[in-house]
Amino acid sequence: MTANFSTHVFSPQHCGCDRLTSIDDVKQCLTEYIYWSSYAYRNRQCAGQLYSTLLSFRDDAELVFIDIRELVKNMPWDDVKDCTEIIRCYIPDEQKTIREISAIIGLCAYAATYWGGEDHPTSNSLNALFVMLEMLNYVDYNIIFRRMN
């Protein structure tokens, strides 16, 4: 006797891509990536080259934030403002380096995965997305565009 289970695999637009074609795609791609990160591994599409690059940003998060697992566990992800203030203690807004920008993305992706749901995002994993969007600006998107391509 076998069970027939139908599972939805989350497959965002940029997941299978190798690169971005326009700076205008960066914010959308990062939004999709954090959302994708909040799904269980078996419920999301395999990463293409572009998402593999984004996954490597977790290494930058380890360098900047040291123990990201403990940081992610202890941050108040139910409060976006408090989370951004904590991150700003590590990384001031003015003149962020490429490593610091990547670390913010890596930290938020780690949080989305850590707090994510089985087949859908949770409020904490969605707040990781909102924290990233709050922390990054157009200049940061330009810098990340160059690193992603």
UniProtKB/Swiss-Prot annotation:
A Pfam family recorded for this sequence: Poxv_Bcl-2-like
Keywords (A to Z) from UniProt: Early protein, Host-virus interaction, Inhibition of host NF-kappa-B by virus
Domain of life: Viruses
InterPro entries: Poxvirus_B14/B22/C16 (IPR011212), Poxvirus_Bcl-2-like (IPR022819), Poxvirus_sf (IPR043018)
GO biological process, one term: symbiont-mediated suppression of host NF-kappaB cascade
S-S pairs: none
Family in the record: Belongs to the orthopoxvirus OPG200 family.
Subunit-structure text: Homodimers. Interacts with host IKBKB; this interaction inhibits host NF-kappa-B activation.
Function: Contributes to virulence by binding to the host IKBKB subunit of the IKK complex and preventing host NF-kappa-B activation in response to pro-inflammatory stimuli such as TNF-alpha or IL1B. Mechanistically, sterically hinders the direct contact between the kinase domains of IKBKB in the IKK complex containing IKBKB, CHUK/IKKA and NEMO.
Protein name, as recorded: Protein OPG200
Species assigned in the record: Vaccinia virus (strain Copenhagen) (VACV)
UniProt gene name: OPG200
